[in-house]
Regions:
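Extracytoplasmic/secreted proteins, especially bacterial periplasmic and envelope-associated proteins
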Residues: 98-102, 116, 120-123, 127, ...
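Substrate-binding clefts and substrate-entry loops adjacent to catalytic sites
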Residues: 102-116, 151-158, 166-208, 228-242
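Extracellular LysM carbohydrate-binding repeats and other cell-envelope/extracellular binding modules
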Residues: 244, 310-346, 371, 391-421
């Protein structure tokens, strides 16, 4: 579906990120010695969690996981537990040394993070399961969002993959996720989940194997197809694994480990960090006029950070009103009555602002597209800017250029209007 690039690893003391280099225990003869250095899947997990979004006091009530005790079990116990999970799903769940290294990550080295994931899962998973069921897909696919985004709906990789399900710009467009100056529907939990399910369904129709569906979600179908050809035509993930990109080689083992960790967290002394909101405590209403969070927070007595958590798709804290697309406001059930009671007053307030032009909002328009331009002979920044309808200063900002000097073959990241692509 998309090329998933390795997210830059950010080291913060509060997360104790000291476990990225380790060797698998070789006490058992059947285990492998694996050097686990700056693993791309773990780096992604940490990077997503380090975002302020999942650390906000507006989301969690407080941690209950003890950071000291981290039980470990024999390979035979892990095998029995994963076999029990495997009987409940059509996705092939196996235990091997590659899976074991990620079980250690999630149950020993990232215990606090897993506690937060369990709390966020209580909020998001009921909706995931409902949509997965509508598409007749395995419910265990919900765990993939933990591997993808650490359940952060505003997660964004340096390559541009965005949201709970990490859609790239063009792939999001392909699955009808609108991106504008106001809204990025890749960050809309429900709409992005529907899009992810559409991808899962079409990918399964192609491969008839859920492990290959997972691999293709990470690296793209093209890379999976190439790996199948290079392996001699095998259509088993473990037989084509060595021909896949580095991150994808870790992706399915990490998924299996997350399935294990979420189902056996209690056996490892991990308890959920309770979220402030649960899925049955929120309600949704379609807006009938453009509104912003600042005024809304005063009317219904809710913090802006809580509005952002419940409504992550709105980029500048404004919910637009357009004829072509319905947009919704999500509020706690306890606040929805206040909104409905004051709905006319709220809309009249913004209507008056528009009439008096006291508040200026950007025009609703499709967002510029991210492209990469390779510098050709004879090109300079001014010429490139003219070609793509942007400014030299913006090109320098996008690419962290200190001067106007560029070289032939250099790659420049540009954000341009669709008509210039």
């Amino acid at each position: 579906m998309k090329k998933s690039f390795r997210i830059l690893f950010i080291s913060l003391l509060c997360f104790s990120l000291t476990g990225l280099s380790f060797t698998i225990d070789t006490a058992n003869k059947d285990s492998l010695k694996v050097v686990f250095l700056d693993d791309p899947v773990v780096a992604k997990f940490d990077s997503m969690l380090l975002a302020n979004f999942t650390n906000s006091e507006s989301i969690f009530e407080g941690s209950v996981t003890s950071p000291t005790e981290a039980p470990s079990y024999s390979d035979s116990i892990y095998t029995l537990r994963i076999e029990a999970l495997n009987k409940k799903t059509p996705i092939d769940l196996v235990f091997n040394p590659y899976v074991k290294q990620y079980i250690k990550v999630y149950t020993q080295r990232r215990r606090t993070q897993m506690s937060r994931m369990m709390g966020l899962a209580a909020f998001y998973f009921p909706m995931f399961e409902e949509v997965l069921d509508q598409f007749d897909l395995p419910l265990e696919l919900k765990y993939l969002a933990i591997v993808e985004s650490a359940l952060n709906p505003r997660a964004k990789s340096w390559a541009g993959a965005t949201g709970l399900w990490q859609f790239m710009y063009n792939t999001g467009k392909e699955y009808d996720l609108k991106i504008s100056s106001y809204v990025d529907e890749r960050m809309d939990p429900y709409r992005a989940t529907v899009a992810a399910c559409m991808y899962f369904q079409s990918s399964y129709n192609l491969y008839k194997d859920w492990s290959l569906v997972l691999a293709s979600y990470n690296s793209g179908r093209g890379n999976v197809n190439k790996a199948i050809r290079r392996s001699g035509g095998h259509k088993n993930y473990w037989k084509i694994r060595r021909f896949l990109p580095k991150e994808t080689r870790s992706y399915v083992p990490a998924f299996i480990a997350v399935c294990y960790a979420m189902n056996y967290a209690d056996k490892h002394g991990i308890s959920p960090e309770e979220p402030k909101f649960l899925h049955y405590e929120i309600d949704t209403i379609e807006v009938k006029y453009q509104i912003d969070f600042q005024y809304l927070s005063k009317i219904v007595d809710i913090s802006i950070s809580e509005l952002e958590f419940l409504n992550p798709a709105y980029k500048i804290n404004v919910i637009p009103f357009i004829d072509e697309r319905a947009y919704h406001l999500v509020l706690p059930v306890s606040k929805m009555g206040v909104f409905v009671q004051n709905e006319s007053e709220i809309y009249n307030h913004f209507s008056a602002l528009d009439a008096l032009k006291q508040k200026s909002y950007p025009k609703y328009s499709e967002e510029d597209e991210r492209i990469v331009h390779r510098v050709r002979n004879g090109e300079y920044l001014g010429k490139i800017a003219s070609r793509y309808g942007c400014s030299v200063s913006k090109i320098k900002k996008w690419n962290n250029l200190k001067s106007d000097a560029i070289s032939v073959g250099q790659r420049l990241v540009l954000f341009v209007r669709p008509d210039y692509v």
